[in-house]
Every structure is written in structure tokens, then in C-alpha cells.
From Swiss-Prot:
HAMAP family: ATP_synth_delta_bact. GO terms for molecular function: proton-transporting ATP synthase activity, rotational mechanism. It is found in: Cell membrane. It comes from the Bacteria. F(1)F(0) ATP synthase produces ATP from ADP in the presence of a proton or sodium gradient. F-type ATPases consist of two structural domains, F(1) containing the extramembraneous catalytic core and F(0) containing the membrane proton channel, linked together by a central stalk and a peripheral stalk. During catalysis, ATP synthesis in the catalytic domain of F(1) is coupled via a rotary mechanism of the central stalk subunits to proton translocation. This protein is part of the stalk that links CF(0) to CF(1). It either transmits conformational changes from CF(0) to CF(1) or is implicated in proton conduction. GO terms for cellular component: plasma membrane; proton-transporting ATP synthase complex. This is ATP synthase subunit delta. InterPro entries: ATP_synth_OSCP/delta_N_sf, ATPase_OSCP/dsu. SUPFAM superfamilies: N-terminal domain of the delta subunit of the F1F0-ATP synthase. Gene3D superfamilies: N-terminal domain of the delta subunit of the F1F0-ATP synthase (1.10.520.20). It comes from Caldicellulosiruptor saccharolyticus (strain ATCC 43494 / DSM 8903 / Tp8T 6331).
Length: 179
């Protein structure tokens, strides 16, 4: 198991005990945003010559007052153990486990033309009944090549109810039977 994943698991267990699943999620991604937007934060975090105590104090100055103390403690622990490089990966491992706990599932919806909220609600209800997907997050893509129908991709599952998919299936069957 990857070290970043172990830290994320420990943090998730703590979040569950403290009733702060969503708060930790938000805070971890606030810190991740610092990586993307604040070069000084990254420079301080990865400065190998700076004393650990100085580094922790400087890093705390970058953090918003709203960041939970447990998240701040995690960052300090990573600095103490010289594992700062794990910090950008922890939010994504946490998100993966968080999504499983609360039932979030990324669902790619491929259609031949735009769909409205009513269609997405029907898909959501079907996913709940058929696959126990409680909180689908839809990412709709329009692909005119499917001709009509719908294709869903989620959790390594593909549900193909497109005209193109049906035609491809018939074509494959005809080729197999012709041999």
C-alpha cells in the first residue's frame, strides 16, 4: 500500500470518529489548491535545507484559519518525518475513500444530443435501483456517432444502450456466424 494512501486512511478514520468527513475533504483540497496556485508554499514545503521547526511555522502561515487542526497536524507530521512529497497525493486517496463511504460515483453519460435534468433524474433513479449508486455525479458528453440512445460508464461498468452499440453487436454476430 502506498504511504500516501495509508495517511489518507488514517485521516479518514479520524474524520469518521470526529464527524468531519466533509470538512477534512474540503480542507485537503484547499491545501491542494495551494500547491497549484502558490509557488512560495511549495518552495517552503520542499526546502531541504530549512530546519523542520522553521518549516512548520512558515507553512502554518500559508494556511487559512479555517483549516482543521487535524489537517495542520498531518502536515506537521509529514514535515517531521520528511515525507512532504506525499502531501499532494493524500487528498486524492482521501477523495476515493470518501466517495465510497457517501456513495458518490462519477458517471460518464454519453448521448447523441444534450439531455435535460429530467433525463438525468431518471438515470439517477435507475442507477440507484440497479447498481445501488446513491449520489451519481454526471459528466455528460455529446457524441453524435452513437446515433441515438445512451451509454453510461462508471465504476469500471459500461452500460451501452446506443443504436451504434446494437449495430456493432449485430455486425459482430453476423461475422462470427459467417465463418
Amino acid at each position: 500500500m502506498l504511504p500516501a494512501k495509508r495517511y489518507a486512511e488514517g485521516l479518514l478514520k479520524l474524520a469518521q470518529e470526529e464527524g468531519k468527513l466533509e470538512k477534512f475533504y474540503e480542507d485537503l483540497f484547499k491545501i491542494y489548491d495551494l500547491f497549484k496556485t502558490n509557488k512560495q508554499f511549495v518552495d517552503v514545503l520542499f526546502d531541504l535545507e530549512m530546519k523542520v521547526s522553521n518549516k512548520k511555522e512558515k507553512i502554518k502561515q500559508f494556511l487559512d484559519e479555517s483549516i482543521d487542526r487535524y489537517i495542520v497536524n498531518l502536515i506537521c507530521l509529514l514535515i517531521d518525518k520528511r515525507r512532504e512529497t506525499l502531501l499532494p497525493y493524500i487528498p486524492f486517496y482521501y477523495k476515493e475513500m470518501y466517495d465510497k463511504i457517501i456513495g458518490n460515483v462519477e458517471v460518464e453519460v454519453i448521448v447523441s444530443e444534450e439531455v435535460d435534468e429530467g433525463v438525468l433524474r431518471k438515470i439517477s433513479n435507475w442507477l440507484l435501483k440497479r447498481y445501488d449508486v446513491k449520489n451519481p455525479r454526471f459528466k455528460v458528453k455529446v457524441d453524435r456517432s452513437i446515433i441515438g440512445g445512451i451509454k453510461l460508464l462508471f465504476n469500471n461498468i459500461e452500460v451501452d444502450a446506443t443504436i451504434k452499440g446494437a449495430l456493432d453487436s449485430i455486425k459482430k454476430e453476423l461475422i462470427q456466424n459467417a465463418i
